[in-house]
Every structure is written in structure tokens, then in C-alpha cells.
Amino acid sequence: MLSTENGEIHAIPITAPLRVGDRRILFRLKRCRESLARLREHPKVALTIFAKGNLAFTARGPARVVQEPMLGAPMFAAIAIDVENIDDHRQRDLVVDSGVSLDWNNERTQRFVQEHLNALREVAASGE
């Protein structure tokens, strides 16, 4: 879940963000969405992850557009978060055993997610 702030907090779901090194996370937003305009105006963001394997953290830092349009997905803009702070939400007595449950079982959706990640990997490899 990505949160941005411009007088009020806006939270939007992010599909399959990609970690690039210790302090950078890539994701993409549709170019026609208001969330992209909000991010340009107010780049300070927080990305919260709760996922299988006891992943529970919030990565905070400025976000910026690194490729628009994306070469592998022209309807999208690639966004990088330059992580400045990480809040660890794990607790000794509680374990996160699953995150948001999505049905990735149909072939079309699996192909979409794979294409999504491949497009982000291309951005990461380009050094943008």
C-alpha cells in the first residue's frame, strides 16, 4: 500500500513492487491516474508491505518518476522510492503468514504480473 500526503493522506494499492538494492524500490503507476499527479506534487511517500514470510515494514522516502512512458509498458510510469527510513513492524509474538490475498491462478493474470515485473527489471537494468 502506497501512501502520499497533500493535506490529507491518500493510500493506493501497488501491485508487485520490485526491490532494487538496499535502499530503492521500483513500482509503476498508470499515467492517467490522479495518484501520479499527486506524487509529482508531493513526493514524500510511505510504502507498507505485509507479506508471507513475516515481512512487515514501511519504507519511507521521496519518490520520483524514473521512466515515462515505460518502454515495456507505455500506459505506465516507472516510479522509484529512494528509501530513507524503514519501520520494522514485526513483533515477537505475532507472525505475518500471508499478505493481501489475490487470485493469481488464471493464466492471463499470471502473464500480466510477469510482464509487470519484467518491465520494472528493464528499468532497473537501464540504471534510471
Please name every model-derived segment:
Residues 15-54:
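A short mixed-secondary-structure module that forms the rim of ligand-binding clefts
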Residues 24, 44-46, 58-60, 76-80:
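Broad gene-expression machinery/nucleic-acid interaction feature
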Residues 9-15:
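A positional/architectural concept
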Residues 1-7, 45-48:
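A short, Trp-centered hydrophobic/proline-enriched beta-strand micro-motif
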Residues 41-43, 61-62, 95-97:
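"Short basic amphipathic alpha-helical interaction patches in structured regions
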Residues 33-37, 55-57, 86-94:
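Short, surface-exposed beta-strand/loop "edge" segments at domain boundaries and coil↔beta transitions
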Residues 58-70, 84:
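Short beta-strand and beta-hairpin "edge-sheet" elements
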Residues 71-128:
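C-terminal edge-of-domain segments
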